[in-house]
Amino acid sequence: MAAAAQSRVVRVLSMSRSAITAIATSVCHGPPCRQLHHALMPHGKGGRSSVSGIVATVFGATGFLGRYVVNHLGRMGSQVIIPYRCDKYDIMHLRPMGDLGQLLFLEWDARDKDSIRRVVQHSNVVINLIGRDWETKNFDFEDVFVKIPQAIAQLSKEAGVEKFIHVSHLNANIKSSSRYLRNKAVGEKVVRDAFPEAIIVKPSDIFGREDRFLNSFASMHRFGPIPLGSLGWKTVKQPVYVVDVSKGIVNAVKDPDANGKSFAFVGPSRYLLFHLVKYIFAVAHRLFLPFPLPLFAYRWVARVFEISPFEPWITRDKVERMHITDMKLPHLPGLEDLGIQATPLELKAIEVLRRHRTYRWLSAEIEDVKPAKTVNI
């Protein structure tokens, strides 16, 4: 009888949320002291209706990479907090990615620390995917890649966040000719200073259905001949698939040994820019007519697009990034170290480029397209 009564008491305590909270509070010594809640206690067999124990705040979730990260987190039963600044209709596509109550949408102000603190205070994981391809009068590259990530990292550290993941770029370099890449490098440093255990992800150019990489090159057919600096013979690219990057980020969240490391996410093959763009046009069944355009002239053309009131198709900084060879960083761990086999460009290019075809070739397969020529430099 005594044993049975004792087992009943134990079962009652184990199901009592108030008791769990009291125990968690009593054993927490020193700031920051965070209460244990149901979303942090894993249960279920896996899948969207389970609870993974991860409560993740994903900054930049409304962007290209963000939708894939949110989907992978939701698929494993994580609770995802999504800060947003856009119209509510622009986040509707994210709602089906998690079970009922698992996706929480909160408006935030990137320059308001109280707003940032509010969206990270209940999370044990914070992922920063905030990015911008061009500068605006409201946010320049220093704001987007340095000041905002620094504030998020500092406030996440103060809130007791266990894992912080910051997405930078493979070619981030303080000496780069690109202002974008220089600020990416500074952003890595300030994040590491504010959150020493941060995981820094350095992907190369990312391709996928909604990208500004393959789609950008493919859309050049509207202008006729394709301008490339030095015809693309001096630039080497190693693009990586967006799903691989997303899986790598989620696996880094689950890997206890990833803290404090930097990861280089790249595709399996390197291509000369000339061969890469030629392959893009072959898959899109478009006529490839390249011509060499000096970079100073390319920048002048880009300046015309910058002063347009519409979204710029090209900017001077993008011209610089387009013609920078992707770094080789063999000393850094990569996708393979997180259990992911990088996807070849040739397997997924058709998903991105089919929409650039004319109606005649819309349903054609890609067996007749020769794979892009790779290089080892």
From Swiss-Prot:
Consequence of changing residue 360 to C: In MC1DN26; loss of function in complex I assembly; accumulation of several low and high molecular weight assembly intermediates is observed in patient fibroblasts
Residue span of the annotated presequence: 1-35
Pfam family, one: Epimerase
CDD domains, per database record: NDUFA9_like_SDR_a
Record-level GO BP terms: aerobic respiration; circadian rhythm; mitochondrial electron transport, NADH to ubiquinone; proton motive force-driven mitochondrial ATP synthesis; sodium ion transport; ubiquinone biosynthetic process
Signal peptide from the UniProt entry: none
Keywords: Acetylation, Disease variant, Electron transport, FAD, Flavoprotein, Mitochondrion, Primary mitochondrial disease, Respiratory chain, Transit peptide, Transport
Regions that span the bilayer: none
Record-listed N6-acetyllysine modification sites: 189, 370
Post-translational modification comment from the UniProt entry: Acetylated on lysine residues. BLOC1S1 is required for acetylation. Acetylated by CLOCK in a circadian manner.
InterPro entries: ComplexI_NDUFA9_subunit, Epimerase_deHydtase, NAD(P)-bd_dom_sf
Cofactor(s) needed by this chain: FAD
One GO cellular component, as annotated: mitochondrial inner membrane
GO molecular function: NADH dehydrogenase (ubiquinone) activity; NADH dehydrogenase activity; protein-containing complex binding
Coiled-coil region: none
Family designation: Belongs to the complex I NDUFA9 subunit family.
PANTHER family found in the cross-reference section: NADH DEHYDROGENASE [UBIQUINONE] 1 ALPHA SUBCOMPLEX SUBUNIT 9, MITOCHONDRIAL, NADH-UBIQUINONE OXIDOREDUCTASE 39 KDA SUBUNIT-RELATED
Related illness: Mitochondrial complex I deficiency, nuclear type 26: A form of mitochondrial complex I deficiency, the most common biochemical signature of mitochondrial disorders, a group of highly heterogeneous conditions characterized by defective oxidative phosphorylation, which collectively affects 1 in 5-10000 live births. Clinical disorders have variable severity, ranging from lethal neonatal disease to adult-onset neurodegenerative disorders.
The protein, known as: NADH dehydrogenase [ubiquinone] 1 alpha subcomplex subunit 9, mitochondrial
Naturally occurring in which organism (per UniProt): Homo sapiens (Human)
